[in-house]
UniProtKB/Swiss-Prot annotation:
The chain crosses the membrane at residues 7-26. Pfam families: RoxA-like_Cyt-c. One of its GO terms (molecular function) is cytochrome-c peroxidase activity. InterPro entries: Cyt_c-like_dom_sf, CytoC_perox, Cytochrome_c_Peroxidase/MauG. Gene3D superfamilies: Cytochrome c-like domain. This is Uncharacterized protein y4iJ.
Length: 596
């Protein structure tokens, strides 16, 4: 009896010790998130999509497995908080909202989350199965809408913008999901709850042991990535709300993690603001640095970067086999693009939102008319005549028709030395090299060209694997009737400004919070400000920038974060594109931009 009576105090002491250690871990690695006030009303601005089109786009499955786990695991996770009893679910709408994810109207997942079919590893051609039932588990990952759906709040109303830049913090979300998995494995009693939710209450110890091994494998993969991040941390820049070093992250995922080559991993040194995507299907070049021509390469590359599974290393299975859903990606692009734009019909896919006068106040039409003249004098040379104007449709602004009868908008490409904005994103793509095995059949070490070739091979593998294989003519259509053009100029493109009022923060790296600040000399722009606030300022055209607990303090003095360039100033210098705007000119131009 004495031995038995001593057992429980020892067990209790051990449990307290483990709990204390985990509490320290939680305190050390906790994710600090903003608290947002509840809104009274939600409104989606009209942008030429039906409710069903919008709902489909919000959850279209590209084949991504962003969180390196099946849906059934994600649904069973608890939030990474310290508790011995059952914690709140990780997929709680209120919790995900704090990262910036928008609650969907009709789905249990937020906007931008896609729940797909069976999760099959292309390296083995085997499904990921529930060890208790033997049934395949299913995919879950991010889709386009996660990064390209905007939101503002204004006096208690949430205003949603399809195709606008999201205000999410994917870095915080990645950290939180990793901690949630860690706690699931090591926090007392949490694995038991997880196993019951995933396997069912009748699962035996053998099935639970297999599940634990699966979890250990995922955690080991996460540790590899954490270790790689530590090695490049000195050169990495925090992305924060509304930004991502997208191209470098895609490269790291494909050429380092998927290819199992740690030497190809680089710092996230060139974060960019999530771009708005209306009109872009009809640009001759896309990405901020005008680096990619073909829609399929752009979009399938994004899917790989958001962690679609791909086989680049196992010769037992076809190389370039992946979970990427090329057919869905084609449908996404079709819905964004619509038909060939014309002077009569304009853009017929996703359109920019109109200024919501009922919420933000009416536009001063007299002032806007004056602003049109300012735009013609100061902006039109780079950003083209206003969309919808007669001048916009002049042939000189468009390519000649291709064999499919399509033509594309020639977006002006401005050298970094002339525009004067932060060069990091353009330099990063131009200078990055990758080391590749000969088995891939890619004969370049240039990051951009290698990525273009790899994505094209991935799409081709999908076409070949269909029954029957997709014919050449249909492949051309699905690829967007454009060649796989890749370039890496030390330059940025100047796109049309329709809907620009709905796309803060500004400049490619998100370093200027409002249009009002952007139209001011660089020395008058905020040197530091907070990102993560959702409240919109209809006078300055941007988010409020007050200090926000759990938000992101943007420091323009850090590499990659410069707010210089694109400057109207009476002092000549790099990046000065015109004389300073007088206060009445600035007010008029702001009024005019609201009309676009």
């Amino acid at each position: 009896m004495k031995r038995k009576s001593r057992f429980w105090p020892i067990l209790l002491g051990f449990t307290v010790l483990v709990a204390a250690g985990l509490y320290y871990v939680v305190r050390m690695f906790s994710v600090d998130l903003p608290d947002y006030p509840k809104v009274d009303k939600v409104t989606w601005l009209e942008q030429n999509w039906s409710q069903s089109q919008r709902g489909w786009m919000h959850h279209a499955d590209q084949g991504t497995v962003t969180f390196s786990m099946p849906y059934e695991w994600l649904a069973a996770l608890e939030q990474p908080t310290f508790t011995l009893t059952a914690g709140p679910p990780f997929l709680s709408s209120d919790y995900l909202d704090r990262f910036g994810f928008i609650t969907a109207d009709s789905s249990g997942l937020p906007v931008g989350f896609a729940h797909g079919g069976d999760l099959v590893d292309p390296k083995t051609a085997q499904p990921w199965v529930n060890p208790a039932t033997g049934k395949p588990l299913t995919t879950v990952g991010l889709t386009c809408a996660a990064c390209h759906t905007g939101r503002f709040t204004y006096k208690g109303t949430a205003v949603m913008v399809d195709g606008g830049p999201a205000l999410t913090d994917l870095g915080k979300f990645r950290k939180a999901s990793g901690l949630a998995l860690f706690f699931t494995r090591y926090a007392p009693f949490r694995f038991d709850r997880f196993a019951t939710a995933v396997l069912g209450p009748q699962a035996d110890e053998k099935a639970r042991a297999v599940l634990k091994k699966q979890l250990d494998k995922v955690l080991a993969g996460g540790r590899i990535e954490v270790d790689l991040d530590k090695k490049v941390a000195e050169k990495s820049i925090e992305e924060g709300f509304g930004r991502l070093d997208a191209l470098n992250r895609i490269g790291n995922q494909v050429f380092s993690l998927d290819l199992e080559r740690p030497e190809n991993y680089v710092a996230q040194s060139a974060p960019v603001a999530f771009p708005h995507i209306w009109d872009t299907s009809w640009f001759d070049w896309v990405q901020y640095n005008a680096s990619i021509m073909q829609p399929m390469v752009r979009n399938a590359g994004e899917a790989l970067g958001v962690r679609a599974f791909i086989n680049l290393t196992k010769s037992e299975q076809p190389l370039f086999a992946s979970t990427v859903k090329v057919d869905t990606i084609f449908e996404i692009e079709q819905q964004l693009a619509g038909k060939q734009p014309t002077a009569e019909n304009g853009f017929t896919g996703l359109r920019p939102p109109r200024w919501p006068s009922n919420l933000f106040g009416s536009i001063d039409t007299k002032l806007a008319t004056e602003g049109a003249a300012v735009y013609a004098d100061r902006c039109q040379g780079c950003h083209l005549p206003p969309v919808g104007s007669e001048g916009f449709w002049e042939q000189k602004h468009w390519t000649n028709e291709n064999s499919a009868g399509e033509r594309y908008l020639r977006v002006p490409i401005i050298n970094v030395e002339n525009i004067g904005t932060d060069p990091a994103q353009a330099q990063s793509m131009a200078e990055r090299k990758v080391k590749l095995p000969s088995e891939l059949g890619i004969d370049t070490d240039s990051f951009g060209s290698a990525l273009g070739a790899l994505v094209a091979k991935t799409a081709a593998r999908w076409y070949d694997n269909q029954t029957p294989p997709v014919p050449a003519e249909q492949r051309e259509i699905m690829n967007g009737n454009r060649q796989n053009g890749i370039q890496a100029p030390l330059a940025y493109k100047a796109r049309p400004l329709d809907g620009i009022w709905a796309t803060p923060p500004f400049l490619h790296n998100g370093s200027v919070p409002t249009i009002d600040a952007l139209l001011s000399p660089a020395g008058e722009r905020p040197k530091t400000f907070w990102l993560g606030n959702r409240e919109y300022d209809p006078d300055k055209l941007g988010y409020l920038t007050d200090e926000l607990k759990g938000g992101f303090k943007f420091d323009t003095a850090k590499p990659g974060n410069s707010n210089a360039g694109h400057e109207f100033s009476d002092t000549p210098g790099p990046g000065v594109i015109g004389p300073a705007l007088k206060p009445d000119e600035k007010a008029a131009l702001i009024a005019y931009l609201k009309t676009l």
